[in-house]
Swiss-Prot record:
This is Uncharacterized protein mdmh-35. Residues 10-63 form the CHCH domain. It comes from Caenorhabditis elegans. Residues 80-103 are annotated as: Disordered. Belongs to the TRIAP1/MDM35 family. A motif (Cx9C motif 2) lies at residues 45-55. Residues 91-103 have a biased composition (Polar residues). Residues 80-90 have a biased composition (Basic and acidic residues). Keywords: Disulfide bond. A motif (Cx9C motif 1) lies at residues 13-23. The gene is mdmh-35. Disulfide bonds join 13-55, 23-45. InterPro entries: MDM35_apoptosis (IPR007918). The keyword Disulfide bond applies.
Length: 103
């Protein structure tokens, strides 16, 4: 792995990110070889990813390095079923409130 890397959004988490990135790069190089047994593949970096992710999420809960609405990003870019359900529920609630106020 080269010395060049993308830093974490939070400097306190950078070391964890570099450890995870190194692990994933090594794993991925094996994963793409023709002889790798994909059906038995276990992600050896999952625990490292979880630790790094927790570090970032803890800081995001208290710090906002950018003016970003994470919920809006999740909705617009991930567009999960959960997001769609919340939208439907919010629309139904808004419609119900509008009907009550116009009566």
């Amino acid at each position: 792995m080269s010395d060049r890397h993308m830093s974490s959004i939070f400097p306190e988490c950078d070391h964890l990110k570099q450890i995870y990135d190194k692990c994933f790069t090594e794993f991925f190089q094996k994963f793409i070889t023709p002889n790798y047994r994909h059906q038995y593949a276990v992600n050896p970096c999952e625990r490292l990813h979880d630790v790094y992710k927790r570090c970032v999420e803890e800081r995001l809960a208290t710090q906002r390095p950018f003016e970003i609405d994470l919920d809006e990003i999740r909705k617009e870019y991930l567009n999960t079923d959960d997001d769609k359900l919340k939208d439907r529920q919010n629309n139904q609630k808004t419609n119900s409130e509008n009907k009550c106020s116009s009566s």
